Amino acid sequence: MVGIVGYGAYVPSYRIKVEEIAKVWGDDPVALSRGLVVNEKSVPSADEDTATIAVTAARYALARAQIDPQKIGAIYVGSESHPYAVKPSATIVAEAINATPDLTAADLEFACKAGTAGIQMTMGLVDSDMIEYGLAIGADTSQGAPGDALEYTASAGGAAYIIGKDNTLADIEETYSFTTDTPDFYRREGQDYPSHGGRFTGEPAYFKHVLSAAKGLFEKTDSKPEDYDYACFHQPNGKFYLRAGKKLGFTSEQIKQGLLTPNIGNTYSGAVPLALSNILDVAEPGDKIFVVSYGSGAGSDGFTLTVNEEIKEKRDLAPKTQDIIDRKQYVDYAVYAKFKGKIKM
C-alpha cells in the first residue's frame, strides 16, 4: 500500500506577537487573540523563502526515509509564494537533495492546499509503479497587507513527505476531494497582497469545502469520527479549526495535537502538512489519522492514514515539529516589516 516513507518540517525561528502588530494599527490585541485564537506567528528571515523552507523540510524527510535520493522520481512543491514567477522551486529542491537529473518536477499552486495536491499526485505515480518514490512539499511565506486582518495570521513554514510503498511509517488508505469555483481569496499577477472576501471566506468557502470533503471521506471509508485517534484540518486561524472539528464530531483530545496556528500563525500551503507532521511525532503504531486540507478558490483534499511500526524507528532521525516551533526569537514590527519587504523605497 502507498504511504509515507519519510517526513520533515521547518518553521522559521523568528516570531512576532499579535499585540506587537495591534500596537502599530491601534487594534485591540486581546479581542484579536481571542477571536482568531492566535497569539503569535512565524516570520521568515531576510534570507528565507519558500525554496529554503522546502529544502530544509525535504532534507529532514530524507533523513527519516533513509533512502537514496536518486530513487525519487517526482518532486512537487506546492505554494502560493514561490520566490520566482518563472523558475521552479521544485528544481532547487531536487538539486539541493541530490535527486537530479532522472526525475520529473513541478511547482503547484492551489492557495493553501497545493501541498496536499502534491501528495495525491505522488500517490498516483507510486501506486501505478511509474516511480518508486515521490516527494511532495507544502510551504509558504505568506503575505498580508499592512493593517489587514490577514497580517495577524499570515506566516511561514512547511513540511515535506516522501511517498512510497516499502517501509512506510504510515499507510495512506484513502483520499477524497471536494472542489468548486469559489472566489473567496485571490491575488492577481503583480499585486503585492491578496484580496479576500472577509466574512464570505467562512461558511460558503472554508466550512462548506472542509465539511463536505470530510463527510465524503467518511462515506467513502464507511467510518465515523470515533474511529480515529487524531484529526487535523486546514487552520487559517485557530477559531475555524476548532469549529470545524466540533461540527464534524471530533473531540478536543482528537484535534489538539494538530492545532499549531495559535503559536505559528497560518502557514498556508504548509498548514496541514505541518499539522500532520506534529501528529506523526507522537502517534503510535495502529493509530488512525483523519486529515482535511483547504485551499481558497476553492477545494479540500481529505486523507485517512494508519500508523505503522516503522514510526518508532524513524521519527527520531530528524528534528520534531514542536522542537522546531519552540526554537524562537521575537522581533518588533520594524524588523518584521524589513524582513517581509513591507517598506517600499
Swiss-Prot record:
Chain positions recorded as CoA binding sites: R199, K239
Q: Where is the active site?
A: E80 (proton donor/acceptor), C112 (acyl-thioester intermediate), H234 (proton donor/acceptor)
Keywords of the record, alphabetical order, are: Acyltransferase, Isoprene biosynthesis, Transferase
* Protein EC: 2.3.3.10
Entry-linked InterPro entries? ACP_syn_III_C, HMG_CoA_synth_N, HMG_CoA_Synthase, Thiolase-like
**What role does this protein play?**
Catalyzes the condensation of acetyl-CoA with acetoacetyl-CoA to form 3-hydroxy-3-methylglutaryl-CoA (HMG-CoA). Functions in the mevalonate (MVA) pathway leading to isopentenyl diphosphate (IPP), a key precursor for the biosynthesis of isoprenoid compounds that are building blocks of archaeal membrane lipids.
Q: Which family does it belong to?
A: Belongs to the thiolase-like superfamily. Archaeal HMG-CoA synthase family.
What is the protein named?
A: Hydroxymethylglutaryl-CoA synthase
- Give the organism, scientific name: Methanobrevibacter smithii (strain ATCC 35061 / DSM 861 / OCM 144 / PS)
